[in-house]
């Protein structure tokens, strides 16, 4: 039926469901049209902006009759900014969508038998993010900060972000004022990560292609002018400036972790703590003695498990993360842990050869999931149990379809609402050898 639709055609109808990614689904003569920022039950008019063989994408033109599932989004940039997809939906609808996204994806892509998925809901749905990364665009011989728009190209300049801070918190406005003073004669772009410290201050991490020496003084003056900044890290491929104290120390359970804004850390402190507690609880139940923690970052999970008396080996390719993991091990006086730097697919076989009795393997890969070679190595090693933590249901389903074909079964599956107001969700799966 694609011949019935052309670009800019307006279509009227009802949104019947949400697709993976959060867009509403409108069916037009059996043809699927995805309409972002709509809710099931909405009566709408939309305009076609993209046509593919099996579906089309449209933009909302008019909301004729709003769904009862709608709420008023508090963010002034919602619908333009590409960061949040679900602010217009009430909390229960968001949770239902995420549960459905996980179970449907595991069944459709993985062809898996999925036990009932438990959802760990977030108590904090706003101002929850530990850090944000803003894009810096050249603007009037200086810079402007913001998020990439829904067109995946334009910059939406912002002065607030309600999933990071309260709406009237001035921190982003202060940042915009500061970066507008930075000369940018080469008209380069960059990135800025803003990390909350536990002392109500912020750490800034700038990344540029090259550094303008004239700006070093301005960064130093910023710490004096804005006491809310505790430290600034400025990096390029060839240089790094460390101004003030760009290191964060955060307490998780009874341990102290030191890191910089460049390190990966889960963004929702409350929800990530539930995940760490779940992993610790499982390892006690399983009576695991030797544990491999793959993609271990700067060692939070590894060190929490080591504090329980488990022997843990963490593997991570990022050299800075491994350096902080080792520092955190010394900081917390934990001897039952070692950290190895390198690609998992290269280090893992060596590690398994030297540690022949690994009880449990924990994997927390990036969005792309596990490589085929890592899956092959794990299937050869056949640990009794695996814990797979994922923020991408599609790659989780792909990997589990291989692992669970003959060797493993899903023993437990828990979802964590780590990213309220967005379409993203974190999943923890406990796999047991058949």
Swiss-Prot record:
Residues 4-62 form the TRAM domain. S-adenosyl-L-methionine binds at residues 266, 295, 316, 364. Keywords: 4Fe-4S, Iron, Iron-sulfur, Metal-binding, Methyltransferase, S-adenosyl-L-methionine, Transferase. CDD domains: AdoMet_MTases. Its EC number is 2.1.1.-. SUPFAM superfamilies: Nucleic acid-binding proteins, S-adenosyl-L-methionine-dependent methyltransferases. Transmembrane segments: none annotated. It holds the Pfam family tRNA_U5-meth_tr. One of its GO terms (molecular function) is metal ion binding. InterPro entries: MeTrfase_TrmA_AS, NA-bd_OB-fold, SAM-dependent_MTases_sf, TRAM_dom, U5_MeTrfase_fam. [4Fe-4S] cluster binds at residues 75, 81, 84, 161. It comes from the Bacteria. The active site is at residue 391. GO terms for biological process: methylation; RNA processing. It is an enzyme of class 2 (transferase). Belongs to the class I-like SAM-binding methyltransferase superfamily. RNA M5U methyltransferase family. This is Uncharacterized RNA methyltransferase pc0248.
């Amino acid at each position: 039926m694609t011949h019935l639709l052309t670009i800019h055609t307006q279509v009227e109808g009802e949104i019947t469901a949400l697709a993976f990614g959060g867009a509403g689904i409108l069916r037009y003569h059996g043809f699927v049209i995805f309409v972002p920022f709509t809710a099931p039950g909405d009566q709408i008019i939309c305009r076609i902006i993209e046509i593919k063989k099996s579906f089309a994408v449209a933009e909302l033109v008019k909301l004729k009759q709003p769904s009862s599932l709608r709420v008023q989004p508090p963010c002034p940039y919602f619908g333009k900014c590409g960061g949040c997809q679900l602010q217009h939906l009430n909390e229960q609808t968001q949770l239902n969508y995420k549960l459905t996204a996980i179970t449907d994806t595991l069944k459709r892509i993985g062809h898996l038998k999925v036990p009932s998925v438990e959802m760990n809901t977030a108590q904090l749905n706003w101002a929850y993010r530990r850090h944000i990364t803003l894009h810096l665009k050249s603007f009037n011989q200086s810079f402007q900060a913001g998020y990439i728009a829904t067109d995946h190209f334009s910059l939406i300049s912002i002065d607030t972000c309600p999933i990071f801070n309260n709406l009237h918190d001035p921190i982003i406005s202060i940042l915009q004022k500061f970066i507008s003073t930075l000369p940018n004669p080469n008209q380069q772009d960059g990135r800025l990560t803003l990390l909350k410290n536990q002392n109500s201050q912020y750490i800034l991490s700038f990344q540029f292609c090259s550094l303008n020496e004239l700006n070093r003084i301005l960064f130093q003056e910023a710490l004096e002018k804005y006491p809310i900044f505790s430290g600034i890290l400025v990096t390029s491929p060839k240089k790094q400036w460390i101004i003030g104290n760009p290191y964060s120390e955060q307490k998780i359970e009874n341990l102290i972790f030191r890191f910089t804004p460049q390190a990966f850390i889960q963004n929702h402190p409350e929800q990530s703590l539930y995940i760490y507690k779940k992993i610790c609880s499982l390892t006690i139940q399983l009576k695991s003695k030797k544990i491999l923690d793959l993609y271990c970052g700067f060692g939070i999970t590894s060190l929490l498990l080591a504090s329980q008396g488990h022997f843990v080996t963490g593997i991570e390719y990022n050299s800075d993360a491994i350096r902080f993991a080792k520092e955190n091990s010394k900081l917390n006086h934990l001897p039952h842990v070692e950290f190895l730097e390198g690609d998992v697919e290269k280090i893992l076989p060596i590690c398994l050869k030297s540690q022949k009795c690994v009880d449990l393997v924990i994997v927390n890969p990036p969005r792309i999931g596990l490589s085929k070679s890592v899956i092959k190595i794990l299937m050869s090693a056949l640990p009794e149990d695996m814990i797979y933590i994922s923020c991408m249901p599609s790659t989780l389903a792909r990997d589990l379809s291989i692992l669970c074909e003959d060797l493993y079964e899903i023993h437990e599956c828990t979802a964590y609402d780590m990213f309220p107001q967005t379409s993203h969700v974190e999943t923890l799966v406990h796999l047991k050898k058949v």
